[in-house]
């Protein structure tokens, strides 16, 4: 009995894995919903991380509150990376989610997954994962275009991005993503206040 309790407390139980899987699926759906207005348009696509960050806060924070263990957020980041790569996104988008998922997990762990402020910061960092593809776009547009052409993106779409993608957009994208993530997280805590109090989430 003691060994079972230790495993459940330290590692992820089957229930934790199922919970993580369910919330990852929801996170993926809301990421798509948040970005669907921006992604199809080569001029607005740079703002897709902002739209996605605006919707996923409550989902992320509720998952953290229900599991409250290391690796859950990491798994979310890895699964998001795999799914997005399979869907034809640039490899840097997937890598961004994986890396920021690990970092977000470590940050949330600093507050034992129970600190409201730390969890919000954790979510903000995770959302930066969605900017990975665009970072490569600005750093190496030629290589980015070659990869996306191989993934099936139309040349006209890429040309429009390169014509309209001024460097100042990168600043707006990063700052906007952080701001949208913070707003989404605060709204999530307001909407689900009772659930978070029950889970022992503190200020």
Regions found by a protein language model. Give the residues of each.
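Short, charged juxtamembrane terminal tails flanking transmembrane helices
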Residues: 1-7, 192-203
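Hydrophobic transmembrane alpha-helices
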Residues: 2-71
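Hydrophobic alpha-helical transmembrane segments
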Residues: 17-22, 50-54, 74-78, 94-95, ...
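Aromatic-anchored segments of alpha-helical transmembrane domains
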Residues: 24-32, 79-87, 125-135
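Short helix-perturbing small/polar motifs within transmembrane alpha-helices
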Residues: 29, 97-135, 185
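Membrane-interfacial segments
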Residues: 34-42, 67, 71, 91, ...
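Membrane-embedded alpha-helical hairpins and interfacial helices in multi-pass inner-membrane proteins
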Residues: 45, 120-193
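Alpha-helical membrane segments and adjacent membrane-interface helices in multi-pass membrane proteins
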Residues: 46-106
